[in-house]
Structures are given as C-alpha cells and as structure tokens.
Amino acid sequence: MILIVEDDAHKSSQILELVNLVIGSGAEVKLVDNVMDAVRFLFEMTPEKIILDMSLPSHKALPGQGTPVPLPTGGIEVLLELRMKSHMGLPILILTQYPEIEIEDEPVPVAESALTFQEEYGFTDIEACYYDHNDSKPWKQKTMEFLKS
C-alpha cells in the first residue's frame, strides 16, 4: 500500500499516473489531502511507502466553511506522527512545489531537506524532490525511482 498525501488534485493525478505506470493499475493506493486524514490513516495502518507534500491543510474542507488554508509545515506534522509510531525507516518521498521547506523555523533547500530530516528527526529512508510544473522530468524520474525501489 502506498500512501499519497497531497492536496493539489492535478499533482495527485500526475503521481497516480506514475504509480500506474511503474507498479500497474492494480496498485493499492490511499490518497488523502490533509493532515488529519493522514494521521488517522497512520493510526490504523502502516503503508509500504509514502509520497508526502509539505504544504497541507490541517483538515478536509467542510460544506459551507470554505477551503482550509494549507499549512507550510503540514507535512512535518505527518512526519512527527510517523516518528511517534517509530516508523522512521519507512520509505518516504517528499514532493513539494516550494524550493525550500521550513524545518524548525528555518528555511532549508529541498535538496538538503532529506539530510536534515535524517539528522534532526531520525528518518533513515527519506528523500526529497522539488515538484516543478514547468519541468516535470526531474521529479517524475525521482518518483519513478522511488516507486521501483
């Protein structure tokens, strides 16, 4: 089971296309679009891999209440939940459309963020990639490699 935590419908559809291409249309995938649903899922199950956005809303949009504002550290909340459950060895690919990730109130370039999450949070199998909608080749390549591993 692959858990995809992504609130952008276009980006999640592109990720799902890659999952189907690499693993096949029968791949077991759970797609959630907010921190609360990701944490609930992780409370009940442990996926084999996670593809994680960093800027996520705290909860699902409720009828008549508007869309929740994405939190720049929403993905970190998911990582903290994984750490609480001692799942620091779970394969994780951070896929974010921002060039930097705010970690402990400090902006860290995406390319350096995986090392920071290893050193500061104890994750052992974490990668990070910049999602560039203008140049899809690098992030698609990285995502396919992650899915194949």
UniProtKB/Swiss-Prot annotation:
Reported modifications of this chain: Probably phosphorylated by DtcA.
TM ranges: none
Protein species of origin: Vibrio alginolyticus
Domain comment (free text): Consists solely of a response regulatory domain.
Name of the protein in question: Detocs response regulatory protein DtcB
Alphabetized UniProt keyword annotations: Antiviral defense, Phosphoprotein, Two-component regulatory system
SUPFAM superfamilies reported for this sequence: CheY-like
Biological function: Possible phosphate scavenger member of the two-component regulatory system Detocs that confers resistance to bacteriophage. When the system (DtcA-DtcB-DtcC) is expressed in a susceptible E.coli (strain MG1655) it confers resistance to bacteriophages T2, T4, T5, T6 and SECphi27. Detocs inhibits T5 infection leading to growth arrest but not complete cell lysis, during SECphi27 infection leads to cell lysis. Overexpression of this protein along with the intact Detocs locus cancels T5 immunity; when the phosphate-receiving Asp-53 is mutated to Ala in this protein, immunity is restored.
Residue ranges of domain Response regulatory in the record: 1-134
Keyword field contains Kinase: no
Modified residues (4-aspartylphosphate): D53
GO biological process assignments: defense response to virus; phosphorelay signal transduction system
Presence of the UniProt keyword Repeat in the record: no
